[in-house]
């Protein structure tokens, strides 16, 4: 007895994205060890899975990878465009630490925050509001860098006015030799930024889906709301906005490199990200699972080792 055998007539019927084959997804839940981590035919030869033993290891290693991208671009004399998330967050402290230790400034870096909470029209909170992603980035990354920080004119946030300019700005940078790196986490419904799986049903083809660069006032999936209630709002569901501004695959699939993170452990054996990680790694790329496309790009996905263990039920 499980969801598959009891779905009919339940409150969950019609809840999941229409393009999800729950039977296939259920089989992915069985994967563990080498069966999970072995490269799939569609993986980019430059894609690498990096297990991290502890959360401290995860934050340090991902922070080092971000700092190393910035340092290498500086040494190469290249501009660096970085699409940045708010979450995971612990890596920014270490990125700052490494850059300061190396004496590397960020004058060549262009930061593009990938998303922001909004209403249905794409209006966002003021940038200095404690709940705004802009505020979070200023506190975690741009501020602590001090005099070596990213220039104000090169910090871009996903507001109604600024997000539609991302594609042209990034395109102009790349045309002059800049490198584009996307830093990301994986959502409960396998979104990248707030690009939700159900959006796939709105496009006539995968090609048109892959070309869309952004969305203002994107309607979020209920599982996204609840994920953020648990991970960012301390269970206070009514404080989570139902819409967000977000980049789309037309931007993140243009990345020259990626740095991803999966750290969704909650403690006492509880977690929220194990199945989402398996869908990302082992499901053939499809617009209905946005994160499944990230393995087709070169770069690294840092993962808490516990998420690679078996997903055996355990009552808590």
Residue ranges, per PLM feature:
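ATP/nucleoside-binding phosphotransfer catalytic cores, i.e., glycine-rich phosphate-binding loops
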Residues: 2-23, 36, 41-47, 52-54, ...
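Ligand-binding beta-strand-loop-alpha-helix segment within the catalytic cores
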Residues: 29-50, 57, 104-183, 238-239, ...
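Glycine-rich N-terminal segment of FAD-binding domains in flavoprotein oxidoreductases
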Residues: 71-103
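Conserved acidic residues
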Residues: 80, 177-183, 256, 299
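Gly/Ser/Thr-rich loops at beta-strand to alpha-helix junctions
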Residues: 82-92, 186-191, 266-267
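A glycine- and small-aliphatic-rich helix-loop capping segment at beta-alpha/alpha-beta transitions
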Residues: 95-106, 128-129, 197-206
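A glycine-rich beta-strand to alpha-helix segment
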Residues: 173-202
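Class I SAM-dependent methyltransferase SAM-binding "motif I" and its flanking Rossmann-like core
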Residues: 193-241
């Amino acid at each position: 007895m499980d969801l598959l055998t009891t779905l009919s007539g339940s409150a969950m019927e019609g809840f999941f994205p229409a393009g999800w084959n729950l039977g296939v997804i259920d089989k992915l839940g069985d994967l563990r060890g080498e069966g999970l981590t072995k490269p799939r035919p569609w993986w980019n030869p430059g894609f690498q899975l990096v297990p991290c033993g502890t959360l401290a290891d995860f934050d340090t290693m991902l922070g080092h990878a971000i700092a190393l991208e910035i340092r290498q671009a500086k040494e190469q004399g290249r501009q660096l465009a970085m699409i940045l998330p708010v979450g995971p967050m612990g890596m920014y402290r270490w990125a700052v630490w490494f850059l300061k230790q190396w004496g590397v400034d960020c004058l060549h870096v262009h930061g593009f925050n990938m998303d922001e909470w909004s209403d249905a029209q794409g209006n966002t909170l003021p940038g200095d509001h404690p709940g705004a992603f802009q505020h979070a980035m200023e506190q975690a990354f741009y501020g602590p860098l001090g005099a070596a920080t990213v220039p104000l004119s090169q910090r871009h946030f996903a507001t109604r006015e600024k997000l539609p300019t991302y594609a042209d700005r990034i395109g102009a940078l790349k045309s002059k030799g800049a490198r584009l790196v996307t830093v990301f986490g994986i959502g409960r419904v396998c979104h990248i930024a707030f690009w939700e799986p159900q959006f796939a049903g709105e496009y006539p083809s995968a090609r048109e889906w892959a070309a869309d660069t952004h969305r203002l006032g994107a309607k979020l999936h209920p599982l996204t709301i609840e994920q953020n209630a648990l991970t960012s709002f301390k269970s206070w569901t009514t404080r989570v906005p139902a819409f967000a501004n977000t980049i789309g695959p037309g931007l993140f699939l243009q990345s020259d490199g990626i740095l991803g993170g999966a750290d969704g452990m909650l403690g006492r054996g509880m977690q929220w990200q194990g199945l989402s990680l398996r869908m990302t790694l082992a499901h053939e790329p499809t617009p209905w699972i946005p994160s499944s496309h990230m393995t087709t790009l070169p770069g690294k996905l840092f993962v808490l080792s516990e998420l690679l263990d078996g997903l055996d039920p355990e009552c808590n």
